[in-house]
């Protein structure tokens, strides 16, 4: 099957390409920069350079494609403007996919709080999902929380914070819960979603990992994997606007990316149902094994100082 992977220079897109090749698919990539594709180590002869926000290159990228993976985000643009950019990109992609006759669209989005109150980041993910679910006959949206992997920006952010802060000052969100998922399991879901039978398509699936934990517990378990001790100080308030700037500086990350991610910590992010692994036939990795694998992969290319 001929498939398109958008965001092919990103963590998930770059890792997905070889998995799709192994499954026997013919893969085309879509990205904004050939330099970023090369830097990500993506081995693809067929890459269309374009921009989903403007629509440039989408027609050529989607031509002759049976299934498309939508892995695009715009969170590193202007802090106040990324939701509008993400919606614009999704609608342009949806229009181009309908025109090209794409049969299936697979989207990786984010878990939504049970109370429906979402951060800007998660509200934007939901708006993108809604646009894409109308764009093909067989759409599938996969909703994940934190993806644990060597190139996952959210995981790397947590590791760098734990490395560089001798004491972890944890706001009120420390007691909120989530279900982080191994990057390998995320990729397996994506591959299987591309060819899943008709009873799996047409809506969204929540793909959490098997271990539910508070954010405080997650930080403690990562610190344990790093073999370091990090005492924590509980704070009574959520100081996300200020804390995100400080945390981004400490971790060496872009504040435009970190601010919306930290806003998402202010709610429980748990799967609505636990049937996705059974439905897709996937055996999930436990959290500690996922962290250890991610750290080992990271150390192949870069020093993780605490180890």
Which residue ranges define each predicted feature?
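Mid/C-terminal beta-alpha module of Rossmann-like enzyme folds, strongest
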Residues: 2, 189-260, 271-307
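N-terminal Rossmann NAD(P)H-binding glycine-rich loop of SDR-like oxidoreductase domains
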Residues: 3-25
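SDR active-site strand-loop-helix element
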Residues: 6, 30, 71, 105-110, ...
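Oxidoreductase cofactor-interface core, primarily capturing Rossmann-like NAD(P)-dependent enzymes
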Residues: 16, 23, 40, 115-228
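NAD(P)H-binding glycine-rich loop region in Rossmannoid oxidoreductase-like domains
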Residues: 29, 34-100, 110-114
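Conserved cofactor-binding/catalytic machinery of classical short-chain dehydrogenase/reductase
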Residues: 54, 89-92, 104, 127-128, ...
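A short helix->loop->beta-strand "cap" motif at the edges of active sites that frequently abuts
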Residues: 99-104, 136-137
